[in-house]
Swiss-Prot record:
It is an enzyme of class 7 (translocase). It is a multi-pass membrane protein. The gene is nuoN. NDH-1 is composed of 14 different subunits. Subunits NuoA, H, J, K, L, M, N constitute the membrane sector of the complex. InterPro entries: NADH-Q_OxRdtase_suN/2 (IPR010096), ND/Mrp_TM (IPR001750). This is NADH-quinone oxidoreductase subunit N. It comes from Laribacter hongkongensis (strain HLHK9). Belongs to the complex I subunit 2 family.
Length: 486
């Protein structure tokens, strides 16, 4: 392909973001302020520019470029907008916390932007190696972010665990991709699907590769039994970093799974559906039962994340447009819930004190009714209690499962959701009905921008619960326009 034939428009958001983050990295060398105001402002402007570029490049149909290795389609565009918003919110939430603990450096913002760049590459990849490159860029940025607080032993330990296990998962994924290549003679997603559908693929090699690919994907999602890193990383990393690790990458991982399973390996759905059923059930059971035993909120939310990934897998394994769109709706709403949940913990923390345990939250309503209400909104939404958006997200994926004859799996999901409600309501009980023994809510140092965004974040959970159709329709149309009628 010559430069004259190259269409750069589909990759405009990534090009804008790469130029911006490279410039910010250089400019930050000359920034002396402790609060990194210039770097922070430039990073937010970079996100605005990336969001504008995403809207400018938005098309209602897939467009391939770079010799078919890159695609701009509605799924990618919706995901990129969500990722840009999540990254901006994470930066706003993290700034004061990082300043209080001495790791507010330019690297905090530039690493988040590089992670965003990796996620954008992931969601627009139409070639398995492009997917892998985006994944590794994201992973390397996250490793560095987790270890950014160098004086923190738990953070360093968490980064090392994530790095070692992440390398293992990447190896499994690459091994599976190599087998798929051996069986189909291509790494292009469309070509792989066509080879399998036409019967020209080596079924044995593709099936073996599928096992390794699903294992690698399960690690990135944090699904059981590849979930070992999730609780340790969530608890060990600084809360400002946990906030980012536990939100935006989940949406990117969803699109990552869609590219592999719903596009490249869609003709082999009968082979990967049973594996996803096992992963979904195991994630629901282990995630909810383990969360009941936790008193550390970050660790509880880690196991909660595992159970949420189980629900998202139910939507994916339905292998229908309704199932994929329900899973996408779930991924976006989970991202919003995670941002709000960890955001409240950050707001209630201050220099010398981290709000991390149930005891810290006891009696919060008597000290700060607004933050207590935000905790209630987040916990009710995660538990799936109407009219919060979490209820409609769970309802959508369970309905998709019922519509393809997996009623028994939907019943398992409902039972696990009822069990999971216990530990969410336990947090609400501590906030509203227990005596104030913790120091959360005392001498808060929250900035006005964080107060505003956190309030909007909480109200969005309620607003999307009352009016969920707009976002769900957007997800459904994106899936239909990107994947066809399937």
């Amino acid at each position: 392909m010559s430069w004259a034939d190259l269409n750069l428009m589909p990759a405009l958001p990534e090009i804008v973001l790469l130029i911006a983050v490279s410039a910010i990295l250089i400019i930050d060398l000359f920034v002396k302020g402790e609060r990194r105001g210039v770097t922070y402002l430039l990073s937010m402007l970079a996100l605005v520019a990336t969001g504008a570029a995403t809207l400018a490049a938005w098309l209602p149909y897939p467009v391939l470029t770079f010799s078919g290795m890159y695609v701009a389609d509605p799924i990618a565009s919706v995901a990129k907008l969500g990722l840009v918003v999540a990254t901006g919110v994470a930066m706003i939430y993290a700034r004061q916390y990082a300043f209080d603990r001495g790791f507010l450096k330019g690297e905090l913002f530039t690493l988040m932007l590089f992670a965003l760049l990796g996620m954008c590459v992931m969601v627009s990849a139409s070639h398995m190696l492009t997917l892998y490159i985006g994944l590794e860029l994201l992973s390397l940025a996250l490793y560095a972010l987790i270890a950014l607080s160098r004086e923190s032993v738990p953070a360093t330990e968490a980064a090392m665990k994530y790095f070692v296990l992440g390398a293992l998962a990447s190896g499994l994924l690459l091994y599976g991709v190599s087998m798929v290549y051996g069986g189909t003679q291509s790494l292009h997603i469309v070509a792989v699907a066509q080879s399998i559908a036409s019967g020209n693929a080596n079924v044995t090699l593709v099936s073996l590769g599928l096992v390794f690919i699903v294992a690698g994907l399960a690690f990135k999602l944090g699904a059981v039994p590849f979930h070992m890193w999730v609780p340790d990383v969530y608890q060990g990393a600084p809360t400002a970093v946990t906030l980012f690790v536990g939100s935006a990458p989940k949406l990117a991982a969803f699109v990552f799974v869609i590219r592999f399973l719903a596009q490249a390996l869609e003709p082999a759905a009968v082979a990967w559906q049973p594996m996803l059923i096992l992963l979904a059930i195991a994630s629901l059971v282990v995630g909810n039962l383990a969360a009941i035993m936790q008193t550390n909120i970050k660790r509880m939310l880690a196991y909660s994340t595992i159970s949420h990934m189980g629900f998202m897998l139910i939507g994916i394994l339905a292998a229908t447009p309704a199932g994929y769109s329900a899973a996408m709706f779930y991924a976006i709403t989970y991202m919003l819930m995670a941002l709000a949940g960890f955001g409240v913990l950050l707001a209630l923390s201050r220099a010398g004190f981290d709000c991390e345990t149930l005891d810290d939250l006891k009696g919060l309503n008597r000290k700060n009714a607004w933050y207590a209400l935000l905790v209630l909104l987040v916990m009710f939404s995660m538990a799936g209690i109407p009219p919060l958006v979490g209820f409609y997200a769970k309802f959508a994926v369970l309905e998709a499962a019922v519509n393809v004859g997996l009623t028994w799996l939907a019943v398992v999901g409902v039972v696990m959701s009822l069990i999971g409600a216990f530990y969410y309501l336990r947090v609400v009980k501590a906030v509203y009905f227990d005596e104030a023994t913790g120091s959360a809510g005392d001498a808060l140092t929250v900035g006005g921008d964080m107060k505003l965004v956190l309030g909007v974040n909480g109200l969005v959970l309620l607003g999307l619960g009352i009016l969920p159709n707009g976002l769900y329709t957007l997800c459904l149309e994106a899936v239909r326009q990107s994947l066809g009628t399937l």
